[in-house]
C-alpha cells in the first residue's frame, strides 16, 4: 500500500504551498497549424531539413520560436509530450529521417525542453500508463542523443548538471556559492551557522497529474523545529545570504542578456509576479567571462543563470537549462511601453544561424 502524508509527515516543501498552475493543452504552434491547413508549399517530396523540438504545448517560448523561424525560412517540427498519444511518428534507425504525421523530415538540430514524462496524459500507476511512459522515455532519449543530428544544449540531452554539481562547478570557476547540505534531517543542519532556507533538490514545479503543476519554492528553515522528523526525501538546506537584488543572466551562444530582479521572497516570481520589478541591466564583464566559461564547460547553448548580488559580489544559485524568458522580457518592457524582446531575438537568430551552418556542412 502506498504511504500518504499525514499532517505530521507532510514534507516541509509541501507545507503551505498553494501555487498551482494548470498548463493548457492545445495546438498553438504556428508552423504546425499552417502545415496542417495546407497553407504552405508541400515541396517536391524530398525530406525537408528542419529543427525538431520536443516540448509541451504550453511552452510559449517555442510557440514564439516557431513564428520567428518561419520568418527566417526555417522549418520547425514539434512533438509535445502532452499531445503525443495520437501522433503519427516513425523514426528510422538507419537514416537521419523521421515521418511526422504526413511529412518526411530531416532533423538537423534537435531541442528538448519541458518534455517531462509527468505531463503525459496517462495514469503511470496503471499498466497502460506505465507502458506508454516507458516507451516515450526510451524513444525520446534515443532521439535527443543520436549522433545523426546536432542538439541544443548537448549536455542537457545526456547528463544534466544537477543542483549540487552546479554549485561545485561554479565554485571551481571562482564564483561564490552559499554553503549547502543535502539531507533528510534539515532541522539538524545550519550550513554557515545562521539563518537557512530549505530548497528542492529537483524541479521547482512537481506535476502529480498531467497539466497540473504544484510549486516547490524555497522556504525559511524554522529553528523551532529542532527535533523534526526525517523528511521522506532529501532536500537542500542552504545558507541564507542577504542580497541587494537578484540577477538573471541569459546566455545565448556567446551573447549575455541580464535582468535585475527585485522581489521580497523567492516564491514571489510565481505567486505574485505583478509585485516583482524587472529591468534590463548590463552584465559585469568579469562575471560574464566566468558565466561563458561555465556554459562552455557544461556544453550549453541556451541557459539562464540565477545569482544573488551581495555588496556587488555575485553569488551563484543555479543554472536553468529549460529556461523561460518571455516573462522577463515583458515585465522589463512594461514601464517604457516597448515590445523589446532581446532574448527571443537572440535565440531565434542563434537557432537560424546554427541551422544554416548544419545545412551547409
Describe these PLM feature segments.
Residues 3-12, 16-18, 282, 296-297, ...:
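C-terminal active-site "lid" helix and adjoining low-complexity regulatory extension at the edge
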Residues 247, 300-311:
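A short glycine-rich, hydrophobically flanked beta-strand micro-motif that places a catalytic Asp/Glu
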Residues 2-45:
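Short N-terminal or domain-adjacent regulatory/targeting segments
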Residues 159, 165-210:
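Loop-centered beta-sheet repeat module
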Amino acid at each position: 500500500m502506498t504511504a500518504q502524508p499525514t499532517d505530521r509527515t507532510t514534507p516541509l516543501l509541501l507545507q503551505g504551498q498553494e501555487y498551482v498552475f494548470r498548463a493548457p493543452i492545445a495546438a498553438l504552434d504556428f508552423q504546425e497549424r499552417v502545415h496542417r491547413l495546407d497553407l504552405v508549399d508541400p515541396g517536391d517530396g524530398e525530406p525537408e531539413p528542419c529543427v525538431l523540438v520536443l516540448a509541451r504545448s504550453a511552452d510559449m517560448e517555442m510557440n514564439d520560436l516557431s513564428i520567428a523561424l518561419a520568418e527566417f525560412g526555417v522549418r520547425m517540427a514539434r512533438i509535445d509530450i502532452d499531445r503525443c498519444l495520437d501522433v503519427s511518428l516513425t523514426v528510422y534507425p538507419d537514416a537521419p529521417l523521421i515521418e511526422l504525421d504526413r511529412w518526411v523530415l530531416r532533423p538537423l538540430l534537435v531541442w528538448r525542453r519541458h518534455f517531462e514524462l509527468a505531463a503525459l496524459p496517462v495514469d503511470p500507476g496503471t499498466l497502460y500508463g506505465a507502458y506508454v511512459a516507458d516507451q516515450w522515455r526510451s524513444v525520446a532519449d534515443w532521439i535527443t542523443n543520436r549522433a545523426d543530428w546536432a542538439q541544443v544544449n548537448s549536455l542537457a540531452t545526456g547528463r544534466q548538471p544537477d543542483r549540487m554539481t552546479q554549485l561545485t562547478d561554479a565554485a571551481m570557476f571562482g564564483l561564490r556559492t552559499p554553503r549547502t547540505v543535502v539531507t533528510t534531517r534539515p532541522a539538524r543542519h545550519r550550513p554557515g551557522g545562521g539563518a537557512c532556507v530549505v530548497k528542492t533538490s529537483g524541479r521547482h514545479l512537481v506535476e502529480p497529474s498531467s497539466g497540473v503543476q504544484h510549486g516547490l519554492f524555497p522556504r525559511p528553515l524554522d529553528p523551532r523545529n529542532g527535533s523534526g522528523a526525517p523528511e521522506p526525501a532529501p532536500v537542500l538546506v542552504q545558507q541564507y545570504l542577504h542580497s541587494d537584488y537578484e540577477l538573471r543572466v541569459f546566455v545565448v551562444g556567446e551573447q549575455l542578456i541580464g535582468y535585475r530582479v527585485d522581489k521580497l521572497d523567492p516564491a514571489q516570481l510565481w505567486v505574485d509576479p505583478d509585485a516583482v520589478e524587472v529591468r534590463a541591466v548590463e552584465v559585469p564583464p568579469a562575471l560574464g567571462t566566468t558565466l561563458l566559461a561555465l556554459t562552455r564547460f557544461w556544453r550549453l547553448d541556451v541557459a539562464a543563470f540565477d545569482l544573488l548580488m551581495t555588496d556587488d559580489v555575485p553569488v551563484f544559485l543555479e543554472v536553468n537549462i529549460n529556461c523561460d524568458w518571455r516573462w522577463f522580457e515583458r515585465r522589463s518592457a512594461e514601464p517604457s511601453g516597448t515590445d523589446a524582446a532581446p532574448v527571443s531575438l537572440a535565440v531565434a537568430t542563434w537557432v537560424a544561424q546554427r541551422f544554416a551552418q548544419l545545412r551547409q556542412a
